[in-house]
Amino acid sequence: MKIAIITGANSGLGYASTQALLNEGYYIYMACRSEEKAVEAINSFDLQFRDKVEYVHCDLSSFDSIRACADHILKNEKQLNALMLNAGLMATPPGETKEGYEMQIGVNVLGHALLADLLLPLIKTTPDARVICLSSV
């Protein structure tokens, strides 16, 4: 079974991508900030898919949360076929990440860069693995 991680998988393009990859036979890790929203999304999938999707907490504004997410994947998987870097913020009120970076840059760029870097060893050992980055401009 192919394995994918999708950030921001509980809504929008992340949710649609989760549905599409479930239909293709993937096991999906929904890397989301809100467990409540992720569980709501999981419960909306057909019953046949609910055992092929798992919520994993990933707050992209916190390097500690990103590291914990990556550690969970690295401890539980021997391959990673797709990493979809989808989550993002736009037009947010002024604020900073836990590490002191401007929130939008911290989440949309630095958080995803750290997650990809931490998962790169697993991606590199998986034949035909893909990293997909989504962005709005």
How does the language model describe each region?
Residues 7, 80-88, 133-136:
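Rossmann-fold scaffold of SDR-type NAD(P)-dependent oxidoreductases
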Residues 8-12:
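Conserved glycine-rich cofactor-binding loop
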Residues 24-40:
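Conserved glycine-rich Rossmann-like NAD(P)H-binding loop of the short-chain dehydrogenase/reductase
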Residues 35, 56-71:
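The beta1-alpha1 cofactor-binding region of Rossmann-like NAD(H)/NADP(H)-dependent oxidoreductases
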Residues 49-53, 72-85, 91-96:
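A glycine-rich helix->loop->beta "capping" turn
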Residues 76-77, 93-95, 118-127:
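A short helix-coil junction within the Rossmann-fold of NAD(P)-dependent oxidoreductases
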Residues 92-106:
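Short alpha-helical oligomerization interface
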